[in-house]
């Protein structure tokens, strides 16, 4: 997995699957939030999954902290997973 951040957008290339990936993503997103942003966009063009720790962290941001989380998903399998978990609205999922 490779990550890049630009403004309030985090782009994640490759599959998200390890606790190290979670730590990297959480650190980047938390840096954006700590910088005062009330919205974070995650561009995930090709991962087929998200770990439960990432899902939990993003839910905390959206539901408890009031951060507008937007997930732009490229792979239909990840989109289907988020749909099955009823997270389309919580993460403002957009299929790209």
Say what each PLM segment does.
Residues 1-11:
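Short beta-strand/loop segment at the start of cytosolic alpha/beta domains
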Residues 16-91:
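Amphipathic alpha-helical interaction surfaces in cytosolic regulatory modules
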Residues 94-96:
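Intrinsically disordered or low-complexity boundary/linker segments at protein termini
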